[in-house]
Amino acid sequence: MNDEKKIYMNSFFFLSLIFSFFENSFEILKYGAYDKVPDSNNLQYRFGTGLGYIGNFWDDANMANLSRKAGYDTQRKKLPEQHLDDWGYYIELDDAKTNTKLGILDVVGYLATPTRGHSSNASSNPELCYPANLYEPIFLNNGSVNPNNYWAYYVNKTVSIYKDYIKIWETWNEPDYTKEYSQVSNWKTEPPDPKILTHWYGSIFSYIRLLRVTYEVAKKADPTCFVSTGGLGYPEFLHAILRYTDEPNKGEVTNEFPYKGGAYFDCDAYHQYPQYGVTDIETGEKYDDNGSDMLAKKVVILKKNHEYILKEFGFDGIKYPKKIFINTETGLNSEKSSSAIGGDLVRRNWILKLALYSILYDVKQTHMLVLADDGTGMGDFSKLWETKSIEEGFTRLKSSSKGRLALQKIHIGKFIYDKEKTEEFKKSLPKNTMGIVLKRKFTKEDGEEYYGEYIYSAWIYCEKEEVGGEIEFELDLSFNPLMIDWEGNEKSIKKNSIIKLSSTPIFLLNSSFIKYELYLILLVLLSLL
């Protein structure tokens, strides 16, 4: 071979290596959530609750009815295998239908708790131990779900029965829970130690396997559903999910285990309780204080952290589809104690601001842990077990929870963040205040009061603690607004009125002199011009 030919062949080989490197580096995967996620355009912001257990008169149907009256319009519904196996898989169907009739929609179905016989540790609490037989084939040769893969069989039956009433399937509960906080930072480079994952007791690879089984089975039963992670807390655990496959030894990519964990969920469900601080991993800013703005921001900054990790792995809406985000557990005590932050005013303000910040940060749902407590905890109602009717129960609604009724009144979930109008509005506000403008995305429904196309909200910003007193200033709006306070009281005011701001948000709506019917007439007349 002459020198010229050698040079040509070597150059060709070198270029082939470069091409192969770049081809692998920029490979676009086309499977599962790497390829597509369900359309989320019809998902409006919703407040939900996990209900909890009260007893006596308060079964799930009555609690759901009461929760709807308290301003909730979604729910985190627990459907454990153990419960369905004991009582029959259809046991929750009537309650699921009741939710739909009440307007409790886009419900989260919480998949968890194998039977003892289907747990990896039958002598322990099955709620805290991963399912057995996860690595059995998911499907048989004829395409049906393999009954020897216990989790697959349970998911298939559950999704098939409840798919008309459940929108999002949450996969387990807090698999990343640990008290060995010093080890968490290692999870960005090493697999978590199964021994310290005390709500899972399995490897990260087996949790990815759980996601894969859930995803492949649920999508076959209902291609329109969302599959979510199981209430994650640590961004480092999410990083590990995205870094590894379900290959059981090292989480490597193989022919049998071709995709990493990001392929197997559409929705990032996370948990954040605002008594715990959060650090923004992108900016390094710490969120440790306990004013209501800071408490609300803690909940959404954890979402921002998860989103940052997802973008690192290409889930940015360009390379791969974006995930949606829901917060399936949070809460704040209605009374302060030596071990927990809380109080009537701070909780009231936190609930209102949490809705506004969640819409700002595009969190689709926020779920409170429980509906009721002894009067001091995170519930909305006090000592419901003493009551025997929905009407009587409603009288136990805590003062700090009543702001959600104002949010329900103005249908805040039908609005989205308007960045341009927010920036303009904030320029007109005094120092130490906060403002957000929302614009309507979803249309008015029959029988629904119309409150216009925009919601302007403003309040005194509370970082370290709740700020007392009021700030007086002159409005500078282009319309005469209807002002609604946290109790739902209405007052029509002028666009240049002098108003007072406190730490509790007020809502200014462009609907004080124009009702929906007139609005429709004007649209028709304009179309004829």
PLM features: residue spans?
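N-terminal substrate-binding region of glycoside hydrolase catalytic domains
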Residues: 28-159, 163, 170-171, 176-200, ...
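C-terminal beta-sandwich/jelly-roll accessory domains of carbohydrate-active enzymes
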Residues: 445-529
